[in-house]
Amino acid sequence: MTEKELGILDKKTDKELYDYQKGAIDQIFDKFENAPDDHHLLYQLPTGGGKTVIFSEIVRQYLKTHKKKVLVMTHRIELCKQTSAMLTSFGVTNKVVDSKANLDDQEDYSCYVAMVETLNNRLNDDKLDISDVGLVIIDEAHYNSFTKLFKFFDNSFILGVTATPLSSNKDLPMKANYDELIAGESIPALIENEFLARAEVHKYDMGLTSLEVGSNGDYTVKSSEDLYTSPAMLQKTLDAYKKHSEGKKTLIFNNGINTSIMIYHTFKDAGLQIMHLDNTATKKQRKQILKWFHETPDAILTSVSILTTGFDEPTIDTIILNRATKSLTLYYQMIGRGSRILNNKSKFTVIDLGNNYYRFGPWGADLDWGAIFRNPEYYFGRIKDDETIESEFRHEMPEELRQEFSNSNTVYFDIRQVYKDATFKGESSKVVLERSIEQHAKICIENSEDIYDALGLAKMLGEDIDARIEVYAKCISKSTYNFIKWLREDYRKKLNSYLRKNFDEVFEQIHGHPPEE
């Protein structure tokens, strides 16, 4: 390394490191000094914690103290450019090895930044000399595409960095490619110390059993689009936005381009400022859309997966998960887009329309990443499937409707528990719906002065009735469309009949006197 390069590395950067970042750097350098030269180390830090800042400072210090070169690998071209710019801000002169790069001057550089596929091609063509690379840094190390390049670096120290040390393929665990994990500052600690914003989650109980799982272990685009492009689902997404985040800058994640486009039209037709972005957009279009999103206070941007990494927009107030995923990494990446601190922004909103909260728990849970790294099979085995998640749903009456039943102390009826009790006693399953009808009738009568009031309230219970029927059908393992449709109609008829027949008697039991004539 030349004296000029050393002088650049010695200059003070404009990046002030936090104590937890300095601590991480010290831990990693301790491994450099004491572990074998070919050691594979994984470092975990949440999105927004400053992984790029940390490994840029590591590169700067490494080049000062080691007479070897550094290679930084990313999985997307946007990340290549951002990483190169960050390294430059730390005084590290670097060369981006892309498909158009001229490598005639590679001897002039001590640090390279490359995208995984481009690097693979250059190495297979023997176009890049890596004989003197002592440190390889892998950004977003949970992607398995990097592992095919490990064979080129048998004598290099490999440092993988990721927010979620869980492989995108459960059959290829990260512990197979990394010797150990260093877990950085947790999300709760970063929130407490005001480095990240706190998430306020609004979760919806979603019926997702129609979704299919593909070969990659996640829900297929086709089955997701079939569900999320339905008129009812599009309206639910719009209603959820209006209820929790109207007027706030919002980023929507979908599992399919068609879904995103239909969300765009649904919100546009409602008079909202929204744009759609997917991977078919040109660089110019993407730049224009992201500029608009940054500058427009109440902007809504609907997208697929293009903005899960390499995108930093601290002004985001709301994240809508208009999709389900079985990937913990994707779950954390999507929510993490809203977690950046800005001025007085200490919290942000998450609207979950994919049961992701129920599947993975709250974003920001203090997960034991060490245990997950060592035994990912145990973690995967604890993730609830959709049927289990939905079996635990408890339907709550909407607030506006609940006001109509203000005289009732409780309006909830546990179909599942009543079914279990009836089965234990050897009773017919039919008694479950009979008791449900009696309870519905009771709360109608509690809030009525005459039979006409009660019948009017019964009409308002449609959603509550349907929810009970859904649970009942699952209890008896009979859930065909026609059967459920018949049950719903029959329930309504029997409820009205029960009210007409028993109104006076039940009213007197409740109030201690008969209804007025």
Regions found by a protein language model. Name each.
Residues 142-201:
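Post-DEXD/H (motif II) to motif III coupling segment of the RecA-like Helicase ATP-binding lobe
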Residues 180-256:
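Conserved interdomain linker/interface between the two RecA-like ATPase lobes of SF2 helicase motors
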